[in-house]
């Protein structure tokens, strides 16, 4: 590898910004920039990013992505925010060749691992982004262009003073719903009950305004769906004795 190539994966580890929201969920400001302390980016992960980004990677841009041109078809696009090491995302892409998957992850070791697994499985219907999800939603995703949004085991930000950092806020749900086609879904999963209740409250608070409905027969959570692969974070939660809560809403 040339020195120029080596800098590509490394520059993705540069400072990123974290969004802050007001108590009613409106976007407020970027509260701080921080260097991601994500552990060592292995040489193999670095090589996967350097050598395969042109096939699997998408970069931030100031206009919406042209999904038919990117994927070469008009299949539904499913966006997953925070795919971790990417194993479950790759598995879903493999199991659903009639859908296109787009994953966002800011941790470069996870991005590198995801690309390696996608390459191993010969996945063609997957693209990944290493950038702040709020900016991607705002600038790169056209309205009514997504078939679904997946958010599995996001950071729960346990302390009450940090709850404003939680990604699931009213404005986030409103923005996501704008990006969904009619019949598109929102699927959240968490192993923290407090965050599960927070997610449910947020979804219920805006569902009439944005036109989404809960498919749960009990009006809250759904049983764990078989189509969602078991993630590393879910396994960790199970070992700690945590419950698992899934939410699934459909856009009218």
Swiss-Prot record:
Gene Ontology CC terms: tRNA methyltransferase complex
Catalytic activity annotation: guanosine(46) in tRNA + S-adenosyl-L-methionine = N(7)-methylguanosine(46) in tRNA + S-adenosyl-L-homocysteine
UniProt-annotated catalytic positions: 155
UniProt signal peptide: none
Binding residue positions for substrate: 159, 191, 231-234
EC supergroup of this enzyme: transferase
Keyword annotations: Methyltransferase, S-adenosyl-L-methionine, Transferase, tRNA processing
Annotated residues for binding of S-adenosyl-L-methionine: 80, 105, 132, 155
Pfam family, one: Methyltransf_4
EC number: 2.1.1.33
Keyword Transcription among UniProt keywords: no
Domain of life: Bacteria
A GO term for molecular function: tRNA (guanine(46)-N7)-methyltransferase activity
Pathway field: tRNA modification; N(7)-methylguanine-tRNA biosynthesis
Its job: Catalyzes the formation of N(7)-methylguanine at position 46 (m7G46) in tRNA.
HAMAP family: tRNA_methyltr_TrmB
Family membership noted in the UniProt record: Belongs to the class I-like SAM-binding methyltransferase superfamily. TrmB family.
The name this protein goes by in its record: tRNA (guanine-N(7)-)-methyltransferase
Gene (name only): trmB
